[in-house]
From Swiss-Prot:
Motif Unconventional nuclear localization signal per UniProt: ranges: 1-18
GN (gene name): NP
Protein name as catalogued: Nucleoprotein
Organism: Influenza A virus (strain A/Teal/China/2978.1/2002 H5N1 genotype W)
UniProt KW keywords: Capsid protein, Helical capsid protein, Host nucleus, Host-virus interaction, Ribonucleoprotein, RNA-binding, Viral nucleoprotein, Viral penetration into host nucleus, Virion, Virus entry into host cell
Location(s) in or outside the cell: Virion; Host nucleus
Modification after translation, per record: Late in virus-infected cells, may be cleaved from a 56-kDa protein to a 53-kDa protein by a cellular caspase. This cleavage might be a marker for the onset of apoptosis in infected cells or have a specific function in virus host interaction.
Amino acid sequence: MASQGTKRSYEQMETGGERQNATEIRASVGRMVGGIGRFYIQMCTELKLSDYEGRLIQNSITIERMVLSAFDERRNKYLEEHPSAGKDPKKTGGPIYRRRDGKWMRELILYDKEEIRRIWRQANNGEDATAGLTHLMIWHSNLNDSTYQRTRALVRTGMDPRMCSLMQGSTLPRRSGAAGAAVKGVGTMVMELIRMIKRGINDRNFWRGENGRRTRIAYERMCNILKGKFQTAAQRAMMDQVRESRNPGNAEIEDLIFLARSALILRGSVAHKSCLPACVYGLAVASGYDFEREGYSLVGIDPFRLLQNSQVFSLIRPNENPAHKSQLVWMACHSAAFEDLRVSSFIRGTRIVPRGQLSTRGVQIASNENMETMDSSTLELRSRYWAIRTRSGGNTNQQRASAGQISVQPTFSVQRNLPFERATIMAAFTGNTEGRTSDMRTEIIRMMESARPEDVSFQGRGVFELSDEKATNPIVPSFDMSNEGSYFFGDNAEEYEN
């Protein structure tokens, strides 16, 4: 994008840093993941986990959730003011899985939040290290994006379930900061805004008084975040209209849904980062790797290289396919839930199957599931090639408008065409171009109609051998142009439930 000079890179957002040069960014991102690794090692010691148990992704997730809960100021305050039966506001915990006599056992643990905060700070040179917490949130969000569908949430806000490719980051907590905002998809932002407008319609005092002033500031900030994701003048102008509305109502909801639909072809810029489970960073730190000295990037070769050398295990239910479980976690690790399957498969070096064909449920195990029949297997998280993660929507011809398949938000900066069914998308735009945004709507529709599915995005960009860390020899893959590339077709995944 043209305004790149004024933007902080997403590593800077991630580490809360001011403008830094590349080396400083690599060092501060390294410091962040190194802190996560040190914390994880300390927790494994506290819990007396064996090496194998410490590499179990379910244990990693429990430990990550505990530290996120320990630092959730708002919820902690709420829990103290509204004591609920059987919930100690000062404690946090979850299931820890241990191997006993050839079987997996579940043990529910409980810790003082204060104690967890102490261990986290100690691992992070005495600082709160909010960036590391956000990093863990984004990893959980990427895992949710790969695992669950948000059809119900889309329908509730009046959007079309086929817009699922716009929903990256829809389960991120509000406190995820600038790094969180960068990875949220257009649909996620639209949904948050619609929910806000609906509350305003139903509750007369929502925009009023001292609280209402704060609400209004939050509303305008969310509008600006969404505006920044759009890459065409007309879409941005419409966002200005929505933001400046005296009292936002149904007209604004209409405009937002129109914009969300338009983003299926005129895609927004959404950042992608490879955020790995805490145990992966822990393994590397334990083996003596110094992240801060070596430097680390979330968007380059580093996460690929880390996964090449990490052995992570997962619990497997009786009729689940371990290869499918691996695919789910691989996609989550690279934030590739909405990427074209042709591209992901090429990079991974094994065919990635659409979610409707996966024989696996989510990674987390519910408390009522029977542990007797649980097995465990190694997750295959290695890749054949690596590629640079993108923050653009892959729009062609000078970043204006291009083809967007109903279900792709590119993750990797790799040349491909973006197959899309224009008829399906354009059918959603019949009629309504009157009202105060009519000229912008007309302009947006005109740009969408001129988009061609055969246009190539990320021209000349390729993947790299894992030995090519300086990215000197791009290998540009050739894809079967007609091949449909979406993960969500024929979907039968579970809904995301909080």
